[in-house]
Amino acid sequence: MSVYHGKTKKRQMLEVDKQHWLPQQVQVTLHALMGAAKEGLLALAVAVGLDVLRSMMEAEVTAIVGPKGKHNPNRKAFRHGAEEGRVVLGGRKVPIQRPRVRTKDGQEVRLSSYEAFQDEQLLTQAALERMLHGLSTRRYHHGLEPVGDDLPAVATSKSSVSRHFVAATRKALAELLARPLGDQRYLVLMLDGIEVADHTVVVALGITDDGQKQILGLWEGATENATVCRALLTDLVERGLRVDGGILVVIDGAKALRAAVRDVLGARATVQRCQVHKKRNVLDHLPDEARAWVSRKLEQAWRETDYEKARTALTSLAKTLDDKYPGAAASLREGLEETLTVLRLELPEALRKTLRSTNPIESAFEKVRMASRNVKRWRNGQQVLRWTAAGLLEAEKGFRRIKGYRQLPMLSEALSRHAAPEASSAVQTA
């Protein structure tokens, strides 16, 4: 057993000796890091990071005033002790002794190495990412990377985290509302609303001519009314949204949205009603025992590859519903032809499946709901907008090209054909 311990001690000495390959400025003793190592690799990394930062600051001081203990008659500054400072590491502020330097006339010399680690944008971004992934302000410190038991931390209180999160979401909202849209050709515009507390936020998602999805804007109101929808669309146009070559607008079926599209975008917009919303609206007028077969009939009609056959099937279904369920029949007839726009444009199946509904926005809404599930009190519309914008932009990071994007030139051509006669008709009328 004694031999075993002897070998262990010898092995530890060899491990310590291996540090000699490191540059002198970044050498750290293993014994000083053993405690941090117990907290895991992240704590070890923070400990090493602090040690490297100390070496960097010392190197910068030496570059300014010269080596310690060596007289330099030409130096313009001198060492002035040290004081406690704070740097940002691991999503919080941690204390560190920072060296001070003064000029001959007593002016403080700022150390760039120290200031680089004081950037509070790192805290703001850390707060944003953690809270968007469901961590509440009260439990924020539980979600931080370990930095070691012997290292105190600040800027992790509920109020501090909340301030940083507000700053981050305010910035996200401002950037989203200021996005220029004139540099891209958007073939598709999807519009849908999400309810947050007593507020409704109408969101616009665009699909470019190469199949990329992008959040274009959002507008808040008490309901999904025409004024709110018109304001959103007007904002998009003012930021450069082009519809001169035609654009497919996929909407959830709200009359306010339909009216706003007509008023702002005019004849250049070709409207596709969301089939998912339409089915939901029709089924809401039916008793449970009738929903299954009506749902099957709707899906069969929408799966048709011929526009006239699909239209005939839906019209026939509406007649069947007339006697027993007139509310469902009326709901189906309202905007019936616009649920078939992707068929009328003769788009291939892959594109039809993608553009038949507002599901791409709905998937982004799920991210907003997940991110904001811990919010217990909604104070105002600005708070709702900030959270929604931040959640949407987080969802946008995971966006992929739509299925069928290689067939988008067919959509572009179809939209141009549709927009041209409408535009010439409008000119003749004028």
Briefly describe each language-model feature range:
Residues 1-36, 48, 54, 58-62, ...:
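Acidic/histidine-rich catalytic cores and adjacent linkers
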Residues 267-284:
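Inter-helix linker motif
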